[in-house]
Amino acid sequence: MQAKAVTKYVRISPTKVRPVMDLVRGKPVDRALAILRYLPHKAAREIARTIESARANATNNYDMAPDALVVKYIFADEGPAFKRIMPRARGRADRIRKRTTHITVIVDDGEEM
């Protein structure tokens, strides 16, 4: 059985989040959280929050054992970008795109319904 958690509009670029996700994909939830705890990336904190939410959803909504959960799927989709203006020389301006990310985590206990 699977449980899902989504964190939307995280103010980090998806290209910065995806390499951190690769470290925990397919690992047990407890091991994944231990790995993320010692990473210096801002993305690691957001991914850990989402994994903890998926674990809580699994235990509270589906009565799964929290120690048997594995991070089955984890991916980052691009959210809307905030557009900002950066003034440049000679009256010009450049557009700055502040990108956002939607983080999705699906945990599984390996049992069929």
UniProtKB/Swiss-Prot annotation:
Question: Can you say what this protein is called?
Answer: Large ribosomal subunit protein uL22
Single GO molecular-function term? structural constituent of ribosome
Gene Ontology cellular component? cytosolic large ribosomal subunit
- PANTHER family reported in the protein's UniProt record: CHLOROPLAST 50S RIBOSOMAL PROTEIN L22-RELATED (PTHR13501), LARGE RIBOSOMAL SUBUNIT PROTEIN UL22M (PTHR13501:SF8)
Q: Which gene encodes it?
A: rplV
Q: Name the protein family.
A: Belongs to the universal ribosomal protein uL22 family.
Q: Name one GO biological process term.
A: translation
Keyword Amino-acid biosynthesis (UniProt) = no
The protein's matches in NCBIfam families, at most eight in alphabetical order, are given as: rplV_bact
Taxonomic classification, please? Bacteria, Bacillati, Chloroflexota, Chloroflexia, Chloroflexales
Function summary: This protein binds specifically to 23S rRNA; its binding is stimulated by other ribosomal proteins, e.g. L4, L17, and L20. It is important during the early stages of 50S assembly. It makes multiple contacts with different domains of the 23S rRNA in the assembled 50S subunit and ribosome.
- Mind telling me which Pfam families this protein's record contains? Ribosomal_L22 (PF00237)
Q: How does it assemble?
A: Part of the 50S ribosomal subunit.
Question: Which keywords fit this entry according to its UniProt record?
Answer: Ribonucleoprotein, Ribosomal protein, RNA-binding, rRNA-binding
The record's section on InterPro entries has: Ribosomal_uL22, Ribosomal_uL22_bac/chlpt-type, Ribosomal_uL22_bac/org-type, Ribosomal_uL22_CS, Ribosomal_uL22_sf
